[in-house]
Amino acid sequence: METYTGIPEELKFAVLERIQPTEPEREKLFAIQEELASQVKIAAEKLGIPGVLVKMVGSAARGTWLSGTHDIDVFISFPEETSRKDLETLGMAIAREVARYAEHAEDRHAEHPYLNITYKGFDVDLVPCFRVASASQIKSAVDRTPFHNDFVKPRIKGHEDEVLLLKQFMRGGGVYGSELKTQGFSGYLTELLVIRYGSFKNTIYAACSWKPGEKIDIMQHGEIEHEEPLVVIDPTDPRRNVAAALSLDKFCTFIDHCREFLKNPELSFFFPAPILPLEDSEILEKLESRKSTQLAVVFKTPDVVEDVLFPQLYKMEQAVAALLKEYDFTVIKTGVWSGNTETAVMMELISGTLPNVKKHIGPPVWVKVHAEKFKEKYQAADGVFGGYIENGKYIFEILRKYPTARGLLEDRLMSCSLGKQVHQSVNEGFEIIENAGICRLKEYDFRIYLRKWI
Amino acid sequence: METYTGIPEELKFAVLERIQPTEPEREKLFAIQEELASQVKIAAEKLGIPGVLVKMVGSAARGTWLSGTHDIDVFISFPEETSRKDLETLGMAIAREVARYAEHAEDRHAEHPYLNITYKGFDVDLVPCFRVASASQIKSAVDRTPFHNDFVKPRIKGHEDEVLLLKQFMRGGGVYGSELKTQGFSGYLTELLVIRYGSFKNTIYAACSWKPGEKIDIMQHGEIEHEEPLVVIDPTDPRRNVAAALSLDKFCTFIDHCREFLKNPELSFFFPAPILPLEDSEILEKLESRKSTQLAVVFKTPDVVEDVLFPQLYKMEQAVAALLKEYDFTVIKTGVWSGNTETAVMMELISGTLPNVKKHIGPPVWVKVHAEKFKEKYQAADGVFGGYIENGKYIFEILRKYPTARGLLEDRLMSCSLGKQVHQSVNEGFEIIENAGICRLKEYDFRIYLRKWI
């Protein structure tokens, strides 16, 4: 077992100095929250909509936001008996009324529509919700949020800095954010970890020994089994795993980040040095030293939000890897990158070419009907090099249909099961670039991605 | 299910015409057997060795030899109570006395020494054995043979032609011969099949539906379980499987040969067209069309009999394939060929080269002690391209030690577990030839082997 050196207080101060909201920042945020709350009330009155309450939720409301983030979540709460239709139309009417004073407004859609506005420089979500009796009786996913707020706020009081440290530490490790692109830790999850373990430090120490199946149930009320690597039962809903979005690899990356940090507690675990984009010459050097085959399937970035796009890209990544494996190519790794205009599914292969001859293994000779059918089929087929018996099975050496990965993808990519928007975009056209060809992709962010890739 | 067309009588006649010993051939063989028998008796008397009997065994004694084969087995039978030492010295003394009239004599050794002589153009084995009460009480493996003779001779009478047909059919299919090179059917096994099934035709029909584990127990006295694909309990020894030497692939090759024959009963199944040696130009053509990598490990043929050599070659074939797989090369197939001067272990690979980068998969991150050790080791190692977490496991991209199969074999072949004589020979020197390099091997028999190989 490692013996860890502990976390110096000076380090924590140095981090907090950079992430704690300043007093003027706090005052401004609170003032804006007040303003928005009264705007909602005024709008409801003006539109003659009764029973509306305003709830400030999220990290802004709980004092756990990182300095520099300007997100405010305003929940417009309707009586439980309101119909879905009324919730949507009346809720959005109020939101739009508030938006009259905003610099910018945009309709968004989760389970229900909501309005995202820019208000005095803040990024504000105006979200209609039902006011239900408990989080286990919610009518819409967003109804849960006010309960989270009620649970966390009193318990986190005095520990806000610990949450800030943990959030920034997770950012530094690339595991902060529960959106479907990142599949990491949500803000609420971070708060629950601090409530459970008492501090940033204790969370880090505990995580070093986490295993998949790790379970945290603060209220001791979990009702069902969960399959995810980390199970944190929602204190406001015994059936929900707050860490359901956390992938196994992000779970492990966090464990690794904690262990490395405790071995050598440094500022860089919170604020890693920026990654420099890879130059053409570096790409060529790396290709030459690895001598593997790099392949990228490049297509126009579909015009959808990341939470829709990335699950489709991850699905495509799996499908492409499966296709390559099915046709005998050995995949070293796969990845996805998506920029403003172009998106790439990346693959590294042992080799992009295979021999023309393919060993096709048939059924055992003694499984008579199958074996005879198999033999008849291949004996008479075109391009058969030869046949023999090995380990009791018929083997035919047949002509490989796709001796190059490029040819395979060009011909069969569209037969992969792809998500709707990705399918559309790929169907409009895609390009397969290989090895030095990837120098064609110049986007700064792609070149940063490449430095991690090769 | 196939419906077979039956076996035309004319076909059988046509085959028998070529393999049935002619009357003069039979007379001559019988005369020579008589001569040898009396030679043995005279020798025993002359040397003053009492209790010696002569037993003519083998196909010559049972009338089931193929025309043109001139093998005679003369067993010199001693009383059971004879010591091993006496059996060997007295038995060989008698044999040597007989050998005085031979054109050529050569000491050979199975479990005991015996003498192989050429006598009036016949290939004769003079084999000392114990005269035991039953085959289950044998003192030496050869003691069993006279019992085989006693069992087969009366039962095969009148069916000798059926045995001849089956033997020749197996020859045509490359499955006749129980020596360790061939791992096929022995003559005795062929006779037992005809006794069991009644005829050549019935044997062929039955074999079409054989499965591994097929059991034939004519005397219904089998005592132990056998693992081999075909189990034919020795009628003279309930513990012995007569088909123990038959490999799974030869078992299957025979099944296949039977099925194909019944689909299209032709003379070529008994007398296949000779295989022509592959010319250099054909080798190059085939390499170009297959585009795989051919490798041959070539060394001086060890000076031992095939029954010693081939098990060692098969073992080497396995060991080399395992070595290549261990280092990530994909083996399509392996084979061995052995000529008078040179021997080659053949391998066909997807590719003889691999990238420099090798994906090294470590333990899951949560298996703390192992995972941390693994990470520490590779993080600090030379030639590491990078590391990441995938499916919960640490992955390091390390520098591949052997990016070519040739380099691997040159460096590590001697670390393979090799048989004694093969080890000696390989240790004295070996050559690795690749692709067009195999044109260097000119032996006629190798070029015939090559035509089957590629």
Swiss-Prot record, chains A, B:
Enzyme Commission numbers on file: 2.7.7.72
Gene3D superfamilies for the chain: Archaeal tRNA CCA-adding enzyme catalytic domain, Beta Polymerase, domain 2, CCA tRNA nucleotidyltransferase, domain 2, Poly(A) polymerase predicted RNA binding domain
Chain residues that bind Mg(2+): D71, D73, D125
Protein family: Belongs to the tRNA nucleotidyltransferase/poly(A) polymerase family. Archaeal CCA-adding enzyme subfamily.
Other remarks in the entry: A single active site specifically recognizes both ATP and CTP and is responsible for their addition.
Function per UniProt: Catalyzes the addition and repair of the essential 3'-terminal CCA sequence in tRNAs without using a nucleic acid template. Adds these three nucleotides in the order of C, C, and A to the tRNA nucleotide-73, using CTP and ATP as substrates and producing inorganic pyrophosphate. tRNA 3'-terminal CCA addition is required both for tRNA processing and repair. Also involved in tRNA surveillance by mediating tandem CCA addition to generate a CCACCA at the 3' terminus of unstable tRNAs. While stable tRNAs receive only 3'-terminal CCA, unstable tRNAs are marked with CCACCA and rapidly degraded.
Name recorded for this polypeptide: CCA-adding enzyme
Gene: cca
